[in-house]
Amino acid sequence: MANEKIRIRLKAYDHRVLDQSAEKIVDTAKRSGAKVSGPIPLPTEKSIYTILRAVHKYKDAREQFEMRTHKRLIDIVNPTPKTVDALMRLELPSGVDIEIKL
């Protein structure tokens, strides 16, 4: 796997869990001898939902809810087979979405 790059995108609603997962991935990759770039914080996606609190009229009585999606990017340059194997066996929390591109 010479001159290749693994790009890992992490998404989560809780930034603390996301940072812990990114740190685990970076430590695992560095221990196996690969060069790591990141974690790079990407822009946070914010979704706002507005609903009416009243049942019939009263348009002034509204409530807003927001959902923030935090993202991180990690690049692993020149991964060894040992690196790929270690990343496959890594246990991460269930609240983190992982997208891997080779």
UniProtKB/Swiss-Prot annotation:
Keywords: Ribonucleoprotein, Ribosomal protein. Belongs to the universal ribosomal protein uS10 family. Pfam families: Ribosomal_S10 (PF00338). InterPro entries: Ribosomal_uS10, Ribosomal_uS10_CS, Ribosomal_uS10_dom, Ribosomal_uS10_dom_sf. Involved in the binding of tRNA to the ribosomes. Signal peptide: none annotated. GO terms for cellular component: ribonucleoprotein complex; ribosome. Part of the 30S ribosomal subunit. GO terms for molecular function: structural constituent of ribosome; tRNA binding. One of its GO terms (biological process) is translation. This is Small ribosomal subunit protein uS10. It comes from Exiguobacterium sp. (strain ATCC BAA-1283 / AT1b).
